[in-house]
A protein has these predicted regions:
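Hydrophobic alpha-helical segments and helix pairs
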Residues: 1-28
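ATP-binding/phosphotransfer module of carbohydrate and carboxylate kinases, centering on a glycine-rich
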Residues: 19-204
Length: 204
């Protein structure tokens, strides 16, 4: 998890975004205004007044930190250099983990696929492009495959495959797979919009 590992994940991105906001003497960044809105505050000055209770609330909810990663990505897309640097560092950290695994498995000379899943990869071109560049440096024949569907799609496909294999579902496998892939995205969009970022409203 994020306390011991998970380098390069959304928790790291959100955490570094929050650190950039509160770092004394830190570079100007649009992340401050994003946090003001995220926390339901009225201004940056209000943010300074609420720093202690806000910190306690954020530390008590790790998902709030991970959700802030979407705001870091938004600022990065708008050209904020602090946000861009956070995403690139996270991608570098993940690439180091991949490099370790590649060397341990002794497959640096192989042509292997790299399937990218998860929110950071799905929603951030900056993150994904940086990751691909870094991995290509130690795995030249890598085939980057960016999956634009959530991980639940893979679980649904695995469940369908098992149901067909066990005889619990008598349907055409290929047709069922295509139907699932076609109907899942709009269904998920209705349940939970992409990059949903719930507000962290302050309370008295």
């Amino acid at each position: 998890g994020p306390l011991l590992g998970d380098r390069g994940g959304s928790y790291q991105v959100g955490r570094e975004g929050l650190r950039a906001v509160f770092r004394p003497g830190g570079a100007p960044t649009a992340l401050r205004e994003e946090l003001v809105h995220f926390a339901g505050l009225s201004s940056v000055d209000h943010l300074k007044q609420e720093i202690v209770p806000l910190s306690v609330r954020i530390l008590g909810d790790r998902t709030a930190v991970a959700h802030y990663a979407a705001l870091v990505n938004r600022c990065a897309r708008a050209g904020d250099p602090v946000a861009v640097a956070i995403l690139e560092q996270a991608a570098d950290d993940l690439s180091e983990t991949i490099e370790y695994l590649v060397r341990q498995a002794d497959v640096a000379g192989c042509a292997l696929p790299m399937v990218g899943t998860g929110g950071m990869i799905r929603h951030s071109d900056i993150y994904w492009n940086r990751l691909v560049r870094q991995v290509t440096g130690f795995l030249p024949q890598v085939r980057p495959l960016r999956q634009d569907m959530p991980q639940v799609a893979g679980r649904a496909l695995a469940g369908l495959r098992e149901a067909i294999r066990n005889g619990a579902c008598h349907v055409d496998a290929a047709a069922s797979r295509e139907r699932l892939l076609a109907t899942l995205p709009p269904l998920l969009a209705e349940i939970r919009p992409q990059q949903e970022t719930p507000s962290l409203r302050t309370t008295r």
